[in-house]
C-alpha cells in the first residue's frame, strides 16, 4: 500500500496528459474541421466541455506537489536548494524551444514561476494558502491560474491532504458531484461564448471540473488500483515531460503534412488515443530498464551534476507520516517528472 501512494500521483499525472492530448487535438484541428458537418461540430464541443481548461490545472497542481518533493530529495542528498536554479534554468530553456513549436507551451511559465516560488517554498502552509487563495480569486478574472495552482499543490504535500481517505471519504464523494454540474455550466458558457459573462463562467467551471476529476480519480484508484490501466497512466506520468514534448512534435508534424485537413473530429479522437496508447507502450518498455525518461534524466544530470544514466533500483525508504498517497516509495519514483 505504501508504494501506491506515490503511484497515485504518477497515475493522475498520466491521466492529465491524456486530457491535455485530447484538448490539443481539438485546438490543432480548429478551423480545419468542416463546421457544416453537425457531427464534427457536436463532437468538438463535447471534447471542449470534457477537456478544455480542466486537465492542464491538474498537471499544474501536480507540478507544485513535485516541487516540494524535489526539495525533499535534494535535502536527503545534502544538496543545496540552489541546485533547483539549475533545473529551473533548464526548464526555461526547454520551454523556450518548445514555444517555437507550440504556442500553448507551459514549460516556460513553469520554469519562471519555479524561480519565484523558491523565495516562499519554506513558508508555512497557512501563508501559502493565503497567497494562493488571493491569486486564485484574481485568476478567475485574469485567467492567470498557474501560480495559485502551484501553491495549492505545495500545500497539499505540506498538509498531507490525503492521509486518511476513510475520514475524508464524504468530501471526495461530494467532489465527484462537481463533474456533472460543471460540465453543464461549461457547455452553457461555450454555447454562449460571445456573452460577457460566459468567459467568467467558463473559467470557474473549468477549474471546478478539474477538482472533480482529481477526487473521482483518487477514489477510483483507491478501490481499483490493481487495474492495468492505472499502471499505464503511472508509466506515462513518470515520463510526463518526455511524453508532453513528444505529443507536440507528433501534432506539429501531422499539422505540417496536412493531416488535420483530412480528418474529421471522430478520426481525430482516435488518432489522439492511438498516440497515447503508443506512448503507454513505449514508456512501459523504457521504464523496465531505466528509472527516468530521456528528458527527465537530462534535467537530473544538470541538477545533481551526475552524468551516468542509472538503471532501475528498488530501495524503499520512509519519510514522515504514513500516507496512502505520498510516503514510503522507491527513491526514484518519488521525484518530479518535471
Language model features with spans:
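Alpha-helical transmembrane segments and their immediate juxtamembrane cytosolic regions
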Residues: 1-326, 332-338
